[in-house]
Amino acid sequence: HRTGPKRAVASGTITPKAMLVAALVTLGVACAVGCTLICYGGWILLPAGVIIALFALAYSAGPYPLSCHGLGDLTVFVFFGLIAVDLTYFIQAGTVETMVWLGSAGVGLLSVNILLVNNYRDMENDAKANKVTTVVMFGRQWADLSNLVNGIAAVWLASYDKPAIALSLIP
């Protein structure tokens, strides 16, 4: 029995074809909006945008969906953390400083924690459906520890050059 939100395609509410069309339209709109950022960040953003779009599709579609083969956490870390934060900063500043890279890693770790909580909840159903998440591979105890370590690491990364922030880690 599923405790999370209803899965539209799996439940038959939406056909796979309709979901694909909706996903491609949404991705197309996102790409069109993203192309306007080339005016601010330069043409280097075009190949970055293509890579982002390809990984958006590869995350849950195609012959080898990353989210079903234990690569969801890494993908979320890279694209919701490093790329999202660093490209945003680059577009505005024209460069990316070390502290931005560290901060983006922290954001990526916190994003992975959100995915871990979701996969923790869905562990049994994912295992039955052969969706191999890191929680399915390594278990709930590993997920608990990962959530803790990711949270502490995110605070440490944010406080790298501001040691007083690390005081928040003291219980």
Report residues per predicted region.
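Acidic (Asp/Glu-rich) catalytic motifs at the cytosolic membrane interface
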Residues: 1-3, 113-135
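Small-residue-rich segments of transmembrane alpha-helices in multi-pass membrane proteins
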Residues: 74-89, 107, 135-143, 152
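Terminal transmembrane helical module of multi-pass membrane proteins
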Residues: 98-100, 107, 116, 120
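Intramembrane alpha-helical segments
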Residues: 7-98
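Conserved small/polar residues in nucleotide/adenosyl-binding loops
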Residues: 171
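Multi-pass membrane catalytic core of lipid/isoprenoid biosynthesis enzymes
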Residues: 2-43, 131-164
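Alpha-helical transmembrane segments
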Residues: 101-112, 162-168
